[in-house]
UniProtKB/Swiss-Prot annotation:
InterPro entries membership: Mycobac_pentapep (IPR002989), PPE_dom (IPR000030), PPE_sf (IPR038332)
Protein name, as recorded: Uncharacterized PPE family protein PPE62
Bias kind Low complexity: ranges: 258-278
Coiled-coil region(s): none
Gene3D superfamilies tied to this protein: PPE superfamily
Amino acid sequence: MNYAVLPPELNSLRMFTGAGSAPMLAAAVAWDGLAAELGSAASSFGSVTSDLASQAWQGPAAAAMAAAAAPYAGWLSAAAARAAGAAAQAKAVASAFEAARAATVHPLLVAANRNAFAQLVMSNWFGLNAPLIAAVEGAYEQMWAADVAAMVGYHSGASAAAEQLVPFQQALQQLPNLGIGNIGNANLGGGNTGDLNTGNGNIGNTNLGSGNRGDANLGSGNIGNSNVGGGNVGNGNFGSGNGRAGLPGSGNVGNGNLGNSNLGSGNTGNSNVGFGNTGNNNVGTGNAGSGNIGAGNTGSSNWGFGNNGIGNIGFGNTGNGNIGFGLTGNNQVGIGGLNSGSGNIGLFNSGTNNVGFFNSGNGNLGIGNSSDANVGIGNSGATVGPFVAGHNTGFGNSGSLNTGMGNAGGVNTGFGNGGAINLGFGNSGQLNAGSFNAGSINTGNFNSGQGNTGDFNAGVRNTGWSNSGLTNTGAFNAGSLNTGFGAVGTGSGPNSGFGNAGTNNSGFFNTGVGSSGFQNGGSNNSGLQNAVGTVIAAGFGNTGAQTVGIANSGVLNSGFFNSGVHNSGGFNSENQRSGFGN
């Protein structure tokens, strides 16, 4: 703020209104109290560890304990000093404010000057008041200068106090890690790369959880910042499986959403409230379009169920601006047929060849579906990558070829997946067999990395748990090509683990390239016994390419025992099917 150009009416008023210096003085008292408590804690902590190591507990272990405890006692002392410094600077700011207010012209004096000036101007007959007007204006200019000088002094004092403050983070960064295999400082856990993480296998800072890539996440397996939950890609999500690689989501509350600021699950788009909507600002379930309130609507700004068009109010209308039931056309009011589409069996369907209620898509079996060939309730179905739109089996899916509930991606088998070709729950990545994975080609849970077999891995091609490095077999490794626990360096390679014949493998008895897990014969696989020739698969006993699950022989499938192409679910031998036994 450039207070030099502000008149004394504003500068004086601002200095004499508000809370004054009382809050800053209260803050100084609080900082003084904190400094005293921290100082007492530092003294007690140091005394206890010293007495323990010199009396009741002696030997190398006691010496190691004392050495590990010393930095924490030092941090408590440093924090006490910083708190005392903050108290002193708060008092300095309060003093600067009081001095500035004492030097500031009182608002009543400024108002009196302006009132006198106005009176003299209004009564200035024949210029007789000119000398008095000049004197009053001169006094006003002096008030202006006095206020500006007071504000300059206040700004200088407050700035000097702020410059004296030392961030607490500097002291925290000097703390050692409590755990093994960490690269960084002040981590409470193992296998972290970064600072101030509480958990294992994180890449980033201040995460509370495991297997995160990013900062300040509360949960596990997230890629991004400030997420609460698991397996999210993006920032500030509350839930699991939101966003996906290349399409991060932010501010979602729920699971498996693709987009931003959705409240619910399985939505594709922004600011939807409900389940399985495709579009923006929808309230309800299975709507395809924007601004719809209800279920199974295709179009925009519809209120009701199963409408196909724009601005309809009611059930099963086809057209625009209709109010009623089963109407076909535009701007009609009343009741038409039970269905406004063709070849439908049921009530209030506006699509074609539907069986059920309130469907606005085509070939659906169920209630409130707005895309094609869905079986279930409230599916909207958007085209995801190479996969056809719709063809979901379940509830509240906005993606394509999903089997389950609340999936916004494609070819998922499970619940709340925002990614594609996953088997499990809350995955925002791709080709995962497990749950809450934000990475890709993982077999396990809460992995934000790629190609891991195990849990809580933020690294790549690890077999085990909580690894933030590359191609490790074991746990809590931040390095690469290590076999064991807590390693931060690089092993000899070309593999880690035991009995591997290929290169860049971790785990046991793999013969391919770039795999993790057990007895994989293909390349870039994770899991167990994926066959020779299988490429980019996750799970168990797969023989197909880019498949996820158990014993799939087809291509781009998720689930169990699928032999076709683009299938989710189980026991499917045809192509582009969701569900079971197709």
